[in-house]
Amino acid sequence: MTPERIQRLTRVLDKRQNDLTVVLENVYDPHNISAVMRTADAVGIQEISVLNTRIGPHKKWGAKSSSSAAKWLTVKQYSDPGSCFADLRRNYDLILTTHLSTEAVSLYDIDFTKSIALVFGNEHDGVSEEIRNMADGNFIIPQVGIIRSLNISVA
């Protein structure tokens, strides 16, 4: 590895946000997961958790969507919500799920000085009630259009 490559990797690692993570619950399409990985890498999130209670663990991500981001991230896969949340509780102060409710806070009002896990649901049903009940609260991504939801790959 060249000295320039080592220097670039060191710079990137120094800017990683180890106090912010993303959790994806039952996301069916591996290309959507890969798109989230690419975004996470771009904004400096190091760790992603993939929780699958309805489908088996993903063996392969959509390579074109992630642009190989998966190899630079720590990706944890879970099949049990309890195990996933036990790990999240050990490492993060606050766990919030995306869910449109009267109690949901705006993404812009979240105190990101705390360590936070943001949970996103699947393409069809969003975050399950079971996972919402395990979390500390809900948040929304404010929108001004008619459609009140975003695809997981862009949220």
Model-based region annotation:
Residues M1-V154:
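Post-transcriptional modification and biogenesis factors for structured RNAs
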